[in-house]
Amino acid sequence: MRRRMLLWLVIVVAVFGFEIQGSTQDIFVAKRALDFHHYLNRYAHLETSDYRMVIPAGTCSYASAGVSHWEDPTGTYNNALYTGEDDTVEWRVYVEEDGLYNIAVTYYPVPGRRSSIQREIYINGELPYEEAGFIEFHRVWGDGGLVQVDNQGNEIRPSQVEIPEWRTVLVADSMGTYSIPLSFYLKRGWNTIALVSRREPVVIGQLEILSLTEHPSYAEVEADYKALGFSPTSDILIKIQGEDAVRRSSPSLFPLNDRSDPLVEPYHHTLIRLNTIGGERWSRPGDWIEWEFEVPESGLYQIAIKAKQHVKRGSYSSRRLLIDGRVPFKEGEAVQFPYSSRYEMVLFGDEETGTPYLVYLEKGKHTLRLENVLGELAEIVRATQESLYELNTIYRRIVMITSANPDPMRDYRLEERIPGLISALERQSRIIGEIAEDLKAIIGESGAQVAVLEQLSRSLWLMADRPFTIPRRLAAFRDNAGALGTWILETREQPLQIDYIVIASPNVELPKTKPHVGQVMLHELRAFLSSFVYDYTLVGNVYSAEDFQVEPLRVWIGSGRDQAQILKLMIEDTFTPETGIPVNLELINIGILLPATLAGRGPDVALGVQDTQPMDFALRGAAVDLTQFPDFPEVAERFHPSALVPYSFGGSVYGLPETQTFSMLFYRKDILEELGLEVPQTWDDVIKIIPDLNKDHMDFGLPYSGIAQASSGAIGEGSATVSVLAHGGVSTFLTLLFQRGEDLYLGDGIATNLESEAAVQAFTQWTELYELYDLPLWYDAANRFRMGEMPILVQDFGFYNFLQVFAPELRGEWDFTLIPGTERDGIIDRSVPVSGPACMILSAARNKEHAWEFVKWWTSTETQVRFGQELESILGPAARYASANLEAVSQLPWTVEEYQLLEEQRSWAKGVPNVPGAYMVGRHLDNAFRRVIYYNEPARDTLLDYNRVINEEITVKREEFDLEVLAP
């Protein structure tokens, strides 16, 4: 008997070992799409020169149904084509020889959703490489008016408006990873070029097929100056203030206030002066700012820029310099601005000799543009990003055998079971070591940036040299790979803050930028004394009843100063001029709302309150019932019916939703394809794929945390909440309950519905997912998704924006879709609980009609769209605003496919009522879950026991507020 068991054991081990080894052949062969770097290497021998062909847009060979001819108001392109968000246009072109060609597109940005225009470029019916699927065309922005001054003496930045104009741009990588434009292989003879829409409409005027040549060096241009007899000018100095920029590629590049330096122009020690531009908002490669200036005479000028790059310690930021739309010579491709804690005058010239590069300017008006580029760091970033992708693959392959927490004393024979592992580790150690050396040569020092690379290189070398130590080094390997991802993000960022630009004759001494000791001391003293008298909670204009002959509304907002300033600007632009109602906006911690209200010092309107607060205040007579206003039904139609549920009780509504968030299913396309797995449609499908993931030591992610805890761009931060969704993984339980067609409460909340068979089944399924299928309770969703340990997970849809910004190396490798559902009567029910903050009117409001006008204005489509666009323009795509206004969502910068998915999931949304005693529901559902998971107690009995406690508390609270209670 023992011999038979031993024989079976040997067979099982042999088969298991064979399967592992057999499934890992050629595992480090790149599976992702071809990138431009490798594409360029493939066709580098086919470079062309001196070629240019213009293709009018109207000569296309194919156009989808939505494409139409466009009447050009400027009369420049009479054969232009309008293309919508889901259109395709294709042209046939003939070239005389095989080769690599650049493509320039002349386009006109028509009104859309204020985001950049995205297209894919197909050559002969195929996407040539990954970057061709993410081509961006910038809109052009400028100030919507002059700088205004509020009644406190602070300057108010003008809103950013689009400046539509014809632009011709070379097709380039949207992430700025390459220092050259993208090029495309065209075979001799006929070819097709297609533009496929991804986001935003645009008008196409023409395409150009051309071959670019390098810019001449300054030495060559200088020789041409001499040959043409150009001479330097004398005694001319022109200052261009940074804040006076006339055009920019992003609405986030607006004028800023900097009072850290007494020599900033203009300056005030306390009040806001818009005196600089750029800063950390100007970090994204590809973004540009343009100024106009005029010179009094023709001749040669020097250029200097008073700027501060105080973010990237031990490194520099780069800018491409363009005069009148052209780079004057090669040295202008990447002007470097080294790290400095204060403003420095950076001369455009030879760094070693201090000799300025002179630029010839004709008398009259000119433009100067600075474009954010990676410069010499471009190849460093590209190579590192490629290495990170392979390191993640290596880590994932190791984890498939060892798990994420291996036994450090066990020899897993990884070098045998993962063919190519050692050579891959050695290769990456060498590559990253070389990158570190290249970076050191570029920045001229061995600082923290280099140390990250050197540490990772050494770690990889040790793992390759001593494979038996890999299990105990695995956690460090994961951390180092995560640090490398952060390193890439930080290296890609190229911030720069500009005070002013100098155009001067070579004989003119440049202005001093360093304040003397007396100026610094006086500045610090004034700023310190002002802090005792200046009220920083008030935003913008502050009004009294005498100013408008009406009592101003007092509105509280509990968010960041950026959000408050956007809102105040919008109030001054539209609400007050249209209604005549003045508003004093105060930036406070919304957590003090309750004590302030009890003390009789609360606001008229509160923005960004947690979803439980309208009901908490209403039950105590402190919130206004909004249904009393005649036009409430019209206002309510702005939202999905589920959005009003948390603020409703007994036929009354005490708040309006600001944002609405819900879960989506995120997945790694590359990993699921590699494992041969389909995206699950139901929870039964999820249960089927969990073993397939587990056998490779991967997990399905189902968060043990509440939707209400995700930010998703909400305007308010709020205080601790007692929302049902704020406790543990209750959102998962509610998802399973709602998908069974049941509600959480009976009647108007007189008792819970947790005794129903559907609730017991949902609770049992919820606990079994963690108990039987061992789903992790706690995890870092972003890093585990990025590293591939958790290739499929449920997350708030705001996770999309996070991945777009913080995991650029995964571009094109992931997607999101509807959450898994429960099949009932042949239909997959994908119901999901939703949550979000609200705005409400306090009962103590002095003028409730005026407060209602403000709330209507705030939740209107126009206001929500503008606020969301302004917020994203300032804080970036990661701060995309999840407005609850349905029409506003349709105007935010999602692609057509993304928007359709979000709206389909929203159609399944169900709100969670906030009833008296509701705080006990989430708390005890979480307690019941823990009892089952940690103490192995039976699910049914545990749920029913806690349900009795919950209902007792609900009864107590309903009696307190004189409401009907459940009969004993």
Language model features: what each stretch is:
Residues 532, 536-549, 611-664, 685-689, ...:
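Hinge/lid segment of periplasmic solute-binding proteins
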Residues 97, 297, 764, 806-879, ...:
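Extracytoplasmic/periplasmic substrate-recognition and gating elements
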Residues 20-506, 834:
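Extracytoplasmic
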Residues 573-642, 646, 670-678, 789-792, ...:
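Extracytoplasmic "Venus flytrap"/periplasmic binding protein-like
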Residues 748-778:
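Glycine-centered hinge/linker elements that transmit conformational signals in sensory
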Residues 817-821, 869-931, 959-968:
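Long, aromatic- and glycine/proline-rich binding clefts that accommodate carbohydrate-like moieties
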Residues 22-24, 299, 383-385, 391-615, ...:
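Conserved N-terminal structural module of periplasmic/extracytoplasmic solute-binding proteins
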